[in-house]
């Protein structure tokens, strides 16, 4: 229906990515972003925390005229960060969860963002290395102007994918960087 009849569909994937413990490795999809990311008109999003889920669902139901794949972590997972009070989900954009000046790291979802956030704290404390951690919930959309603003003068850019290396968000970020120079 999504491709042939041009009908809006909201897909929800659970147990996607590398999940700690829980249901085991045979139930974890690590190829969904690459498999679904190239489907025309299909937007892929993974919320960073419970607070972002409502905005993602509202986007899928009320704002996106095309189909959406919402990638959820369906096991309890506590996060060491909070979204800013004024945070609004905007297509292709995210939000800095932690400021930094030595490097910037883009990630998504509660598992990878939590690990990135905790790693940034260790780097700051033990090595005086300042890592900016950015939540980018859009898995196959990156706003080039926003990306450029987030990077600014920082020369080290990293991504963490909760996915196979090929076809994940990191490739979309790299492609956008090559487009904007």
Language model: regions and residue ranges:
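Structural signature of the thiamine diphosphate
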Residues: 13, 33-85
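Flexible, glycine-rich active-site loops centered on histidine and acidic residues
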Residues: 16-18, 25
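Short, contiguous, pocket-lining structural segments
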Residues: 28, 48, 108-112
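Short hydrophobic alpha-helical runs that function as membrane-insertion/retention elements
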Residues: 10-11, 44-46, 132, 159
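Flexible, small-/acidic-enriched active-site or ligand-binding loops
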Residues: 24-30
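Thiamine diphosphate
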Residues: 1-15, 20-21, 30, 66-68, 72-181
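Alpha-helix C-terminal capping segments
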Residues: 1-8, 37-38, 177-181
């Amino acid at each position: 229906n999504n491709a042939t009849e041009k009908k809006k569909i909201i897909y929800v994937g659970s147990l996607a990515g590398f999940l700690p413990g829980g249901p085991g490795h045979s139930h974890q999809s690590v190829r969904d972003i690459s498999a679904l990311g190239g489907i025309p008109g299909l937007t892929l999003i993974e919320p960073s925390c419970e607070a972002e889920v409502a905005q993602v669902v509202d986007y899928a139901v009320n704002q996106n005229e095309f189909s959406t794949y919402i990638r959820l972590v369906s096991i309890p997972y506590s996060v060491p960060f909070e979204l800013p009070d004024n945070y609004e989900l905007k297509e292709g954009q995210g939000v800095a969860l932690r400021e930094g000046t030595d490097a910037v790291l883009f990630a998504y979802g509660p598992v990878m963002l939590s690990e990135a956030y905790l790693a940034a704290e260790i780097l700051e404390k033990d090595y005086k290395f300042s890592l900016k951690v950015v939540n980018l919930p859009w898995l196959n959309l990156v706003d080039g102007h926003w990306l450029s603003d987030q990077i600014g003068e920082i020369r080290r850019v990293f991504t963490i994918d909760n996915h196979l290396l090929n076809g994940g968000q990191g490739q979309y970020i790299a492609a956008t960087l090559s487009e904007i120079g």
